Amino acid sequence: MTVTDTLVENSRRYEEGFDKGDLPLPPGKKIAILACMDARLNPYGLLGLEEGDAHVIRNAGGVVDDDAIRSLSISQNLLGTEEIVLVHHTDCGMLTFTDEEFAGKLEAEAGERPSWSAHAFTSPEDDVRSGIEKIRSSPFIPHTTTCGASSMTCMRGS
């Protein structure tokens, strides 16, 4: 049995016991979280959230790119969120390469460069500041939106 097979089976069991179907579509706390996709990071646990509380949007690095703005815009303009929190962390994989290195690797393996940027960064703090500025300057995010940031320290085991 593959990991995917196991996950599909887990999904079936979860659906059978799912009891949150009556939760409203808009998140109860009217907040959207943009977080890194790092498997060690649990935004719900980190921020004390439960299902139905928030929209949790994840990507590599938790960067504010066009797709993040798209999701945040839908969350804000159609589903009533009023606050956005960016979650970055130490020991992030996005700190381990440059955009040029990654594009070169993909070109070597796939025969062409991607049309998009990986948005690697050298400082989580600077990327959070940049992300907040991108959100605040976007015409697609209401200017009444409150932005904040959270960070988590990841410690590697010895």
Region annotations inferred by a language model:
Residues 1-27, 62-67, 74, 78-79, ...:
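Divalent-metal-activated hydrolytic enzyme cores
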Residues 13, 17-70:
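Conserved beta-strand-loop surface patch within small alpha/beta domains used
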Residues 34-36, 58, 87-89, 150-153:
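Short beta-strand segments
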Residues 37-40, 90-94:
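Gly/Ser/Thr-rich loops at beta-strand to alpha-helix junctions
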Residues 46, 50, 59, 91, ...:
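Short glycine/serine/threonine-biased micro-segments
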Residues 78-89:
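Ordered, amphipathic secondary-structure segments that act as subunit-interaction surfaces
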